[in-house]
Each structure stands twice: as C-alpha cells, then as structure tokens.
Design a protein with these regions (language model features):
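Conserved N-terminal/central alpha/beta ligand/cofactor-binding core
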Residues: 2-13, 49-176
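N-terminal Rossmann-like FAD-binding beta1-loop-alpha1 element of flavoenzymes
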Residues: 18-46
Length: 176
C-alpha cells in the first residue's frame, strides 16, 4: 500500500493506493483477504467502518447455519445436486450456485483448520442436519454465535499475515 497526504482549500486528506481493497471485516471480507494473500497478492488493504461491529460478529440465533456439501452419513451428494438445490430456491443464479457448491467443502474445511469447532461424529465425519428446503444434511452449526466464531478465526488468520487495515472509515467510492 502506498500512502500519500495532500492538502487543498484548507483541508488535508490521506490517499491510499493498493492493488486490492477489501471492504468490510465480516466473514466475507476476511475470507476475501486471506486467500488473496495465500495466492501471493501482498498489496491488500482492508477498510472497515468498525472492526468490532457488523452482522457477522454481532448477531446470534439458534438458526445460524453453515451450508456445505454433505460430509457425513450414507447419503451421497454432489456439487451439481447442491447447485441445483440452491438454484431451485430462485434466489441464486446458476453460475453463482455452482461456484458456491463447488467451493463449499474447501471453505468449510478451511474454517475447521482455523479453529471453528464444527461438530463431528465418532468416526470423524462432520455431521449435518436437514433444513426446511434441503434434501440433504448440508447444514451445520456451532451454536447461536456460529458467524462470530467464524469471523474471529478468520480475523486471527488475517492479522497473523500482517494484512493492513484501516478502521473507523466509511468507503464511499473506490477510484480505479
């Protein structure tokens, strides 16, 4: 990140230039910055309005669920079946549904490796349960603060890499 300061008309401002700006410090923001770093991109900047605020960190519900390919039990599952289930709800475009399904197990196992304690059975399978409109046992949870635990584990991974963050700023426009 390159940083410059300039003044005009009695006001001063800071200009930050980077290859990749990630906006937000919820699970999506952290999970965007972390793999970019792993792929070799070092010129990353995370910008957030409040690192300790936001939906991922501060909501709780008995229905907080992580949705992934089925990783336990006798029922088979496939990327295509999961994509079709997502698409059939008429809220996810087909190409997005396919990407979400294809990367769901990898993303889930990354969270496990970072320390999110998703439940397992005695054979080591990551157990799941059925939700209202899902034909498989794809849902899993660590309780009412699942997304908080995911956020905190991803945040630790990003901080360990030293990815810079600007906190208490609101992104209005990104100039490219």
């Amino acid at each position: 990140m390159l940083e410059e300061r300039f003044s005009a008309g009695g006001f001063s401002a800071r200009l930050c230039r980077c290859n990749t700006a990630v906006v937000g410090t919820g699970t999506a923001g952290y999970n965007a910055a972390d793999p970019l770093w792993q792929l070799g991109q070092r010129d990353i900047l995370i910008v957030t309005e409040n690192r300790l605020a936001g939906t991922s960190r501060n909501t709780g519900s008995d229905k907080q669920t992580y949705y992934k390919l089925t990783l336990s039990g006798p029922e088979g599952d496939s990327v295509r079946e999961m994509a079709e289930t997502l698409f059939s709800g008429q809220c996810v475009d087909g190409d997005i549904a396919l990407c979400e399904a294809a990367l769901s197990a990898q993303s889930f196992l990354k969270l496990v490796e970072l320390g999110v304690p998703f439940p397992r059975n005695r054979y080591g399978e990551y157990i799941g349960y059925k939700t209202d409109h899902d034909p498989r046992r794809r849902a899993t949870s660590v309780g009412p603060y699942t997304s908080r635990q995911m956020t905190e584990c991803l945040e630790q991974a990003v901080q360990a890499k030293g990815i810079p963050m600007l906190d208490h700023l609101q992104v209005i426009r990104i100039l490219s």
